[in-house]
């Protein structure tokens, strides 16, 4: 299981908050909520699930660096593309310059 902290998510209203939980529960790799922690079944998730997590985390301003752990050889070509809206949030400059790959 993989635990992703959603602490500090920003909501515009009660329904906005409710939609975060509903949206996450619709992602196939979702297992359960543990307070404000999103728990996934496995670190091995589909490209579609990863794209949904990227959108969800971006929408609610949840720290996106924790999504870097889902980088694989298979998704590297699109997931680590510098032109994407998530690149700077997921792969901070420190991560790239430290030689981590």
Predicted regions: what they are:
Residues 36-44:
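A generic structural motif
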Residues 34-35, 67:
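Residue-level detector of family-conserved "landmark" positions at structurally sensitive sites
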Residues 5-7, 41, 65:
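A structural detector for beta-sheet-dominated domains
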Residues 6-15:
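Short, surface-exposed ligand-recognition loops at beta-strand->loop->(often short) alpha-helix junctions
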Residues 1-3:
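Extreme N-terminal starter segment of soluble prokaryotic enzymes
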Residues 44-101:
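Helix-rich interaction surfaces within compact, conserved domain-sized segments
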